[in-house]
UniProtKB/Swiss-Prot annotation:
Compositionally biased region (Acidic residues): 318-333
A Pfam family this chain is assigned to: Ribosomal_L10
Region entry Disordered, spans: 299-342
Protein name, per record: Large ribosomal subunit protein uL10
Cellular component annotations (GO), alphabetically ordered: cytosolic large ribosomal subunit
InterPro entries per UniProt: Ribosomal_protein_uL10, Ribosomal_uL10, Ribosomal_uL10-like_insert, Ribosomal_uL10-like_insert_sf, Ribosomal_uL10-like_sf, Ribosomal_uL10_arc
Function according to Swiss-Prot or TrEMBL: Forms the large subunit's ribosomal stalk, playing a central role in the interaction of the ribosome with elongation factors; the stalk complex of P.horikoshii binds to E.coli large subunits and confers on them the ability to interact with eukaryotic elongation factors. Each succesive L12 dimer bound along the P0 spine increases the GTPase activity of elongation factors and increases translation by reconsituted ribosomes, although the first site is the most stimulatory.
Family matches, as HAMAP family: Ribosomal_uL10_arch
Length: 342
């Protein structure tokens, strides 16, 4: 039987103890991180109540299996499937989604390397550069960067996108970007998988658009609120709106029935007055008294003054169409949320 070094046994024991001490265990790839950024990340993680431990992949695997067995949590052992590249163990009290967001927000820019894939579009900005005239001007122009010499310095004539997200950096472009001090790459801890409460989360699950979900939940809340009010389902959030709706409905019925109260008297009189004017419009002018004629004339002037122009009519039609489209999109969003939560 091969002899196992004592330090390896101790390392596995310490890693297993660490895993058992926290509710959230993440496997992260540290292989792309230089020493200084890695030390900064260790500090940030400690400040946020976690710990990062880098070790050999085989020892991490043994530690996970040991911890899973001792905790009686066989699902924890599924993490082993995601050990890859230069793995490290990150333990924390953050939930997996907050942890993923935290690591993404703390990625740092890095210099261009030939053969590397850029995570986002790379733009060379317009303006003067610190570069002196020389062969680099021709090299830039050959790569489609509009450069020329102005006042003894190399100047870029306009903002130029030299790489789209997902494209590979060529050696020639890497030289130019490094000369300009443009750092198109990012270094950080890449999440391989995160374990919490019997579930292993992968990066594709953790990379959610928070604002999109917030918008969906807000729309769902409004739809639920409106539904509850319309079916008179009382809750602390809806009771006031339900009472207001009931009051307005009762008031409308009372007005229609001509039932006089202090709340309805003005509306009933106003309704009768408008009915009187409508009837007066149908009668010959010679049977009307002067007061009624004055009222009809004033009503006609108000109608002319408030008549919308053709441009306003078009704008109203456009607004109505936009409202219909918005209602349709809200219905689609609600349907999507219903599908999401079953």
């Amino acid at each position: 039987m091969a002899h196992v070094a004592e330090w390896k046994k101790k390392e596995v024991e310490e890693l297993a103890k660490l895993i058992k001490s926290y509710p959230v265990i993440a496997l992260v790839d540290v292989s792309s991180m230089p020493a200084y950024p890695l030390s900064q990340m260790r500090r940030l993680i400690r400040e946020n109540g976690g710990l990062l431990r880098v070790s050999r992949n085989t020892l991490i695997e043994l530690a996970i299996k040991k911890a899973a067995k001792e905790l009686g949590k066989p699902e924890l052992e599924k993490l082993v499937e995601y050990i890859d590249r230069g793995a490290g163990i990150l333990v924390t009290n953050m939930n997996p989604f907050k942890l993923y967001k935290f690591l993404q927000q703390n990625r740092q820019p890095a210099p261009a390397k030939p053969g590397a894939v850029v995570p986002k579009d790379v733009v060379v900005p317009a303006g003067p550069t610190p570069l002196a005239p020389g062969p680099i001007v021709g090299q830039m122009q050959a790569l489609g960067i509009p450069a020329r010499i102005e006042k003894g310095k190399v100047t870029i004539q306009k903002d130029t996108t030299v790489l789209k997200a997902g494209e590979v950096i060529t050696p020639e472009l890497a030289n130019i970007l490094n000369a300009l001090g443009i750092q198109p790459l990012e270094v950080g801890l890449d999440v391989l998988a995160v374990y919490e409460d019997g579930i292993v989360y992968t990066p594709d699950v953790l990379a959610i658009d928070e604002q999109e979900y917030i918008d969906m939940l807000q729309k769902a809340y409004m739809h639920a609120f409106n539904l509850a009010v319309n079916i008179a389902y009382p809750t602390p959030e809806t009771i006031e709106a339900i009472i207001q709706k009931a009051f307005l409905n009762a008031k409308t019925v009372a007005i229609e029935a001509g039932y006089i109260t202090k709340e309805t008297i003005q509306d009933i009189i106003g309704r009768a007055f408008r009915a009187m004017l409508l009837l007066a419009q149908q009668l010959p002018e010679d049977v009307l008294d002067e007061k009624t004629k004055e009222l009809l004339s004033a009503q006609a002037q108000v109608a002319v003054a408030t008549q919308p122009s053709e441009e306003e009519k078009k704008e109203e039609e456009k607004t109505e169409e936009e409202e219909k489209e918005e209602e349709a999109s809200e219905e689609e969003a609600l349907a999507g949320l219903s599908a999401l939560f079953g």
